[in-house]
Amino acid sequence: MEKFASVLLSGLLLVACGGNQARAKRPEAPVTPKEYTYAVRSVHPHPTTSYTQGLQFADGLLWEGTGEHGESVVQTLDLETGRTEVFARLPQEDFGEGITLLDGKLYQLTWQSNKAYVYDLKTGKKIKEFRYPGEGWGLTTDGQKLYMSDGTANIYTLDPATFK
């Protein structure tokens, strides 16, 4: 009787563990990643003293937000000549981060000051300032809303009028 019980138990364990089927499964072939190629179409001059944190191309100019303690600016860069023109200077205590353009305004994040600045594109004057929790990193738009990253796994969708 004991022999029968032990054979029965062994058989049940074999079936429960998949028996020969578990060994019959073959691992899937590794997926080969798709390889992309690229070609550099042109190279443009750029000041090596500008620590780029945000870029956007619009109306023939490259808009650049730079980050540097005490020296963060938003500037335009003419890609043909390499000439830059300062559009706005951030307060000394702010480290500039991501920028984006929307509806005649330029939005800029700060890294750890918890502030976003909004400038009028025609005059360069600051027209609004918003506060937000956490750090500011990247900023973009879909033409209606703003999308902000803060260095975490989250992307935040924001109303440009309220920054909420």
Located regions from the model:
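Beta-rich, blade/repeat-based domains predominating
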Residues: T48-D59, Q92-D103, Y132-S149
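A short beta-strand motif characteristic of beta-propeller blades
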Residues: V40-P45, R83-R89, K125-F130, K164
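Short loop/turn segments that connect beta-strands within beta-propeller blades
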Residues: D78-G82, D120-G124, P160-F163
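Structural signal for beta-propeller blades
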Residues: E71-V74, K115-A116, N154-Y156
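C-terminal motif of bacterial Sec signal peptides marking the signal peptidase cleavage site
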Residues: V15-A16
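Beta-propeller domains
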Residues: E64-A88
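A short helix->beta-strand "capping" segment at the edge of beta-propeller domains
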Residues: A29-T48, L79-R83
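Conserved beta-strand positions in repeat-built beta-propeller and related beta-rich domains
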Residues: E64-E68, L106-S113, M148-T152
